[in-house]
């Protein structure tokens, strides 16, 4: 009987090992002080996860919070990369740059390693969870992960409600006393609507080392308040640091929960046409709960289907005018939209520009619109129409840009001025569109009799309104 049991366990071990086709190590620094251990699956699904072990920014717990995850992840077809980052010793840029470099290598090597470059997640534990949340919220678009897995994460850098030594080791002896740095790197404060990737948070309720409520729960709350996709699993017991350890009472349930979350994540097709929705609160989804799933860009994704990949880059209150009170082109969302490298762009700006404090700079509206267009598509730097001549047929350009006129302002909420929109802003948009050979989607005319499709403020579309917007814009895109 013992012999049968021995051989059964041996076969299971061999089967698990067989799920990993290749294992090797890459130096992230010339001296090898930072390394990335690579586990490539035998049957790749295209998904990849970059692992970030914990250890309070003083050591690396890179077994049960690192390499031991390789068998289970490779069995799911997930490529796994453990970053053994350098410790900060007060210089937070050191571990940040190591993890960013790891993600960049994974994306740059995606074709070679059979990975979808936009299905690369990050998985961090404890202090490594904090580092993962920093990358997810504060890093540039090209190294920001597509999804985030946080195990019992340190989130707050306020040592009074967090893990004291993680705060000191990350920010430094002087830095952890600086309120501005504490606020910046307490990553619940850095969550951005639409831009921070979907997350799953896994903790035990009896964690005595990193308080769940002021850390993992705080990150979940920030994500939910922003309308971003986020799940949280809190198990009754387990304390801190269980990782992939089989001693964790809820180990099997945890793997099932995590596996289901990963399996339900939708990945864009590799050749999908990228659609960037640029705009103000109407694009952002003001007044639409969970706008990332129910705003007009999300509905546009549903209507266009899997051959398109739609992303929401809307930011509430923003102006096209660079001298406006909140210029769109100063935003992270604008930089992300450019880095997204879209095939199609839908621009829906102008409503906030009509406010008196902004429209005093109306002489610059055309120039700023031209700046936005030529930044998106440098080919447009030479307009398709010379002054005084008929517009000629525009040459094909990438991205294809659609200019949307603002929907009517049925009320003057926030000093938004319908007369300025109708008689000054829209004519400039139409003039520029003609000069550059762009298509105008005239939402202003199409919504003229649709006061029932806006919220009580008379400005923002309600659920019916965002569906109508998505229908109109999808029809325009599909005609091409």
PLM feature segments, named:
Residues 208-215:
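Conserved alpha/beta-hydrolase "acid-adjacent" motif
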Residues 46-54:
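Short beta-strand element of the alpha/beta-hydrolase
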Residues 101-166, 182, 187:
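Primarily recognizes the serine-hydrolase "nucleophile elbow" in alpha/beta-hydrolase
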Residues 182-183, 302, 328-480:
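Alpha-helical cap/lid subdomain in secreted, periplasmic
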Residues 61-63, 68, 81-117, 245-253:
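Catalytic nucleophile-loop/oxyanion-hole region of alpha/beta-hydrolase
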Residues 200-207:
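Short beta-strand/loop motif that positions the catalytic acidic residue
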Residues 37, 92, 217-268, 456-459, ...:
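C-terminal catalytic histidine-bearing segment of alpha/beta-hydrolase fold enzymes
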């Amino acid at each position: 009987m013992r012999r049968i049991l021995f051989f059964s366990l041996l076969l299971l071990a061999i089967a698990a090992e067989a799920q990993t086709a290749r294992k090797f190590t890459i130096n992230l620094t010339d001296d090898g002080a930072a390394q990335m251990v690579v586990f490539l699956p035998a049957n790749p699904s295209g998904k990849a996860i970059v692992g970030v072990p914990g250890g309070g920014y003083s050591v690396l717990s890179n077994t049960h919070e690192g390499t031991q995850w390789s068998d289970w992840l490779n069995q799911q077809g997930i490529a796994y990369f453990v970053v053994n980052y350098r410790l900060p010793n007060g210089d937070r840029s050191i571990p940040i740059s190591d993890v960013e470099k790891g993600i960049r290598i994974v994306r740059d090597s995606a074709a070679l390693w059979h990975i979808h470059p936009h299905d690369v997640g990050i998985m961090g534990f404890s202090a490594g969870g904090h580092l993962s949340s920093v990358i997810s919220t504060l890093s540039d678009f090209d190294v920001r992960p597509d999804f985030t897995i946080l195990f019992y994460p340190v989130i707050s850098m306020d040592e009074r409600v967090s893990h004291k030594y993680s705060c000191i080791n990350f920010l430094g002896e002087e830095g952890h006393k600086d309120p501005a740095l504490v606020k910046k790197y307490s990553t619940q404060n850095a969550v951005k609507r639409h831009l921070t990737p979907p997350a799953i948070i896994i903790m035990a309720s009896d964690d005595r080392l990193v308080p769940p409520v002021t850390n993992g729960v705080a990150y979940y709350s920030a994500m939910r308040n922003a309308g971003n996709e986020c799940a949280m699993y809190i198990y009754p017991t387990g304390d801190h640091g269980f990782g992939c350890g089989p001693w964790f009472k809820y180990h099997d349930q945890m793997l099932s929960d995590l596996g289901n979350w990963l399996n339900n994540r939708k990945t864009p097709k590799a050749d999908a046409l990228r659609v960037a929705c640029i705009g103000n609160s109407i694009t952002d989804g003001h007044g639409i709960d969970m706008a990332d799933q129910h705003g007009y860009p999300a509905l546009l994704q549903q209507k266009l289907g899997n051959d398109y990949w739609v992303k929401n880059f809307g930011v509430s209150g923003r102006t096209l005018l660079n001298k406006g009170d909140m210029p769109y082109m100063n935003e992270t969302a604008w930089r992300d939209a450019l880095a997204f490298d879209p095939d199609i762009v839908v621009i829906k700006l102008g409503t906030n520009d009509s406010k008196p404090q902004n429209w005093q700079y109306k002489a610059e509206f055309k120039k700023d619109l031209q700046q936005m267009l030529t930044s998106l598509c440098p080919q447009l730097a030479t307009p398709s129409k010379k002054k005084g001549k008929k517009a000629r047929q525009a040459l094909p350009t990438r991205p294809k840009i659609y200019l949307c006129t603002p929907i009517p302002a049925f009320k003057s909420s926030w000093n938004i001025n319908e007369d300025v929109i109708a008689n000054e802003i829209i004519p400039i948009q139409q003039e520029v569109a003609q000069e550059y050979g762009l298509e105008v989607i005239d939402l202003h005319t199409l919504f003229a009799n649709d006061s029932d499709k806006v919220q009580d403020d008379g400005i923002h579309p309600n659920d019916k309104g965002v569906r109508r917007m998505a229908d109109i814009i999808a029809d325009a895109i599909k005609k091409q």
